Amino acid sequence: MLHAMRPVLLVAALLAVTAHAFLGFGSGSTHKDDAEWGHYHNQAQLEAKLGEINEKCPEITTLYEIGQSVEGRPLVVIQFSTTPGEHIPTKPEVKLIGNMHGNEPIGRELLLRFAETLCNGAINNDKEIVQLLNSTSIHILPSMNPDGFELALGTEPAQRQWLTGRSNINGVDLNRDFPDLDSIFYELQKIGVPKFDHLLSLFEDNVDRQPETIAVGQWTLSLPFVLSANFHEGDLVANYPFDAAIDENSQKTAYSASPDDGTFRWLAKSYADNHAHMSKNDHAPCDGTSQDAFARQGGITNGAKWYSVAGGMQDFNYLATNAMEITLELSCEKMPEGSQLPRFWEDNQKSIFEYVWKSHSGVKGMVVDAMTGEPIKRAVVWIRNGTETVPVKHPVTTWSEGDFYRVLPAGKYEIIVAAEGYDIAAKNVTVENKVRDSALVVNFALSPAADEPSENEQEQIAELVNEIARRR
């Protein structure tokens, strides 16, 4: 489990490649953009900018600190919502995280600029942004590793090595510091135990995790996040779970599909296709080899097929919570000159917006007691694709207010809901994803079960569990 968690405070060189592979092509930046966004914001400047945005848009933003770095720098989140600080049932929560590796700060700057764009759009009554903010709660953590960033920023570019500032100040790679839930998932598969989600309760080790990991881990567990993205550098590709190889030798690379492989591929492809270059054959592979020519495979990759990572954040999200997270590699070059940042914004702006909109795909709804109308928390929601005979081996659970969310591509599905003390309920639906600001709403009112389940009900439950267990 995540040890010593504190409560969330809510209130080196690469092979030569063509320049456009990591610099971007955009030519629409203005002199004002270059002055404002053509440099990296240090910690003090970042905090000041977030404060400025909050003051400019107080009705739709709130600032909160989820913890501190080893050296005491605050991990500050800015939330955008029509009800900042309050979760509204069936309104999806999205989080975006930058600068997990201190020497990979493009995401830090993109997220800071995304925050300002949301604020300015709301002020100017931009139709798309107003629609997005009316329907979505967006949490932005520009920097998860401010200590590493300050180290990298304070090192002369000529002296900066490939790993300078990557880890936190204790020398720990934060993307290897989360509980390794993949190993638990693979072991449960091997022995045939039908447990596929929320695996943190089964995890135990004696590792003293880093304060940045603890803060983000606790934050991830504190809200019903639906969708998440983690911004990195070192290549140009959208990476999706699983990150840890299913092979017993965790160092071996092998395609390791999650139960939601199709959905994750769809999410990653959405980002890559909306990016100026990620999915296009207009740039050389970052490492100069055909093996990692990601553009030829649509600008996406399964994490473990690329290289195996145990203790990564995106798999933690998937196996500990209801959230789906992908990792976005934005540049071959790490920490490029600040003057190039406006071009990166041009390359990624559409992708970021379209990715957040994906939180409104699939289905969502409420699960309540049919007799009292009271919400049922921790109800288990299974999804069966219409082309499959058994459910996806990864259910989601309802939040404390009875709401659930399931990101899905268009298709026909059966939704099966089970809760202790209630009869199982199921509905068949067609997901079209044609409504931009809302997933398909599918509500359930569960009837209380008899004191002793009938033989038929027991058989139904046993059959459902056995079918899921057999799908290995």
Swiss-Prot record:
Signal sequence extent: 1-21
Note describing how the cofactor binds: Binds 1 zinc ion per subunit.
Positions with a binding annotation for Zn(2+): H101, E104, H232
Keywords (A to Z) from UniProt: Carboxypeptidase, Cell projection, Cytoplasmic vesicle, Glycoprotein, Hydrolase, Metal-binding, Metalloprotease, Protease, Signal, Zinc
Cofactor: Zn(2+)
SUPFAM superfamilies: Carboxypeptidase regulatory domain-like (SSF49464), Zn-dependent exopeptidases (SSF53187)
Glycan-carrying positions: N134, N385, N428
Enzyme Commission number: 3.4.17.10
Gene Ontology molecular function terms on file: carboxypeptidase activity; metallocarboxypeptidase activity; zinc ion binding
Active site (UniProt): E329
Reaction(s) the record says it catalyses: Release of C-terminal arginine or lysine residues from polypeptides
Protein name: Carboxypeptidase E
Provenance organism: Caenorhabditis elegans
Gene: egl-21
